[in-house]
Amino acid sequence: MATNFLMHEKIWFDKFKYDDAERKFYEQMNGPVAGSSRQENGASVILRDIARARENIQKSLAGSSGPGASSGPSGDHSELVTRIASLEVENQSLRGVVQDLQQAVSKLEARLSALEKSSPAHRATTPQTQHVSPMRQVEPPSRKAATATEDDEDDDIDLFGSDEEEDKEATRLREERLRQYAEKKAKKPALVAKSSILLDVKPWDDETDMAQLEACVRSVQLDGLVWGSSKLVPVGYGIRKLQIQCVVEDDKVGTDQLEEEITKFEEHVQSVDIAAFNKI
């Protein structure tokens, strides 16, 4: 176990031997030239030992760089072989799939060509330029097609006249509903535009009989005029004015007409003013 531990150590225990050999080599090289051939042979041997030692050191350093360095090449080789085998199997399966696809495509092409040959529309197909050409002449419909159309129209005719009866019934119901609607609309009273007017009727002086003045005003009767409440309002110096309310229809009674009718009573009425005017 100790030996295995020392195999992975990076300490160079024999370095002094190689240092001594290298020193002796350089001493002999730098020494006198009259050396014998034996010395030259010894120097070459030393050089070879040094080179071999360096190679061993490099190998030992490379081998001790990782615990799995010795088993690396064999492991890589086995993994490569396994991968190649899996690729070959995958290649074979892909080839089978491609062959199946080619066979399916060839069958489809054969079937399509057979359908095109057997189709009557394919035989009568013309170039598309003839369909869109403005100079193309439209052939009149054949007599046979016209006869078939007439037969279809004859088949659609109801011999018992049920459609006509239904149309008459629908027309009668529609007319009846329109008549009822017109009668209902005629009975409904039309909206009449009306206005509420407050009049100020002023007398000549404080001696004017206000009861007689009010009776004169209320004696004015017009179509669309309705008199309302009234009261006496003091003006000053013992004089009072008549404030009376009325409702008029705008289309029938105008304010000017109403003032003219009231001012006809010159003995009692001095003037008529509109104090308020409101639409109803």
From Swiss-Prot:
**Which GO molecular function terms does the record list?**
guanyl-nucleotide exchange factor activity; translation elongation factor activity
Where is the PTM N6-acetyllysine found along the chain? 17, 107, 117
User: Which residue positions does N-acetylalanine occur at?
Assistant: 2
Acidic residues bias spans: 149-168
Location of region: Disordered? 113-171
**GO cellular component: a single term:** cytosol
What keywords appear on the UniProt entry? Answer: Acetylation, Elongation factor, Phosphoprotein, Protein biosynthesis
Residues recorded as bearing Phosphoserine in the entry: 37, 44, 60, 86, 106, 119, 133, 162
What does the record note on quaternary structure? Answer: EF-1 is composed of 4 subunits: alpha, beta, delta, and gamma.
Please identify the protein, giving its name as recorded.
Elongation factor 1-delta
Originating species: Bos taurus (Bovine)
